From Swiss-Prot:
GO terms for cellular component: box H/ACA snoRNP complex; box H/ACA telomerase RNP complex; Cajal body; sno(s)RNA-containing ribonucleoprotein complex; telomerase holoenzyme complex. Pfam families: Ribosomal_L7Ae. It is found in: Nucleus, Nucleolus; Nucleus, Cajal body. Belongs to the eukaryotic ribosomal protein eL8 family. InterPro entries: eL8/uL1-like (IPR050257), H/ACA_rnp_Nhp2-like (IPR002415), Ribosomal_eL30-like_sf (IPR029064), Ribosomal_eL8/eL30/eS12/Gad45 (IPR004038), Ribosomal_eL8/Nhp2 (IPR018492). The keyword Ribonucleoprotein applies. Required for ribosome biogenesis and telomere maintenance. Part of the H/ACA small nucleolar ribonucleoprotein (H/ACA snoRNP) complex, which catalyzes pseudouridylation of rRNA. This involves the isomerization of uridine such that the ribose is subsequently attached to C5, instead of the normal N1. Each rRNA can contain up to 100 pseudouridine ('psi') residues, which may serve to stabilize the conformation of rRNAs. May also be required for correct processing or intranuclear trafficking of TERC, the RNA component of the telomerase reverse transcriptase (TERT) holoenzyme. One of its GO terms (biological process) is rRNA pseudouridine synthesis. Keywords: Isopeptide bond, Nucleus, Phosphoprotein, Ribonucleoprotein, Ribosome biogenesis, RNA-binding, rRNA processing, Ubl conjugation. There is a cross-link at residues 3, 5 (Glycyl lysine isopeptide (Lys-Gly) (interchain with G-Cter in SUMO2)). The keyword Ribosomal protein does not apply. Gene3D superfamilies: 3.30.1330.30. This is H/ACA ribonucleoprotein complex subunit 2.
Amino acid sequence: MTKIKADPDGPEAQAEACSGERTYQELLVNQNPIAQPLASRRLTRKLYKCIKKAVKQKQIRRGVKEVQKFVNKGEKGIMVLAGDTLPIEVYCHLPVMCEDRNLPYVYIPSKTDLGAAAGSKRPTCVIMVKPHDEYQEAYDECLEEVQSLPLPL
């Protein structure tokens, strides 16, 4: 008797490949009630690319404690918050800090995707991207779109 080899392009292989990545709509199901303004799918992709470029230049702050410390010191940049972080109390004070200091901020759907964009295997609930000459064009484009989003009431 011979073994029957599984077809590498069969339906099981395709199902496994698709199950690893969730769609934008699936990620929106787990959002916090405070996750406003929420980035669109297109803006989310632009932010991920900008974050990846910022990581290469070491122009990034990640984590609540580090971001809060540097915002208090007066550092400028775009704050990107994950909309699926629980409990909300972990980072609910950060949007207020941003509004007091006129810093742009935006929520994206997934903390795991945010951590992956920052080059980490761990989920990250907040990242601050600082401007730099190497990726200034991408940064300015993201900044303009984030500032055009309506702030919550």
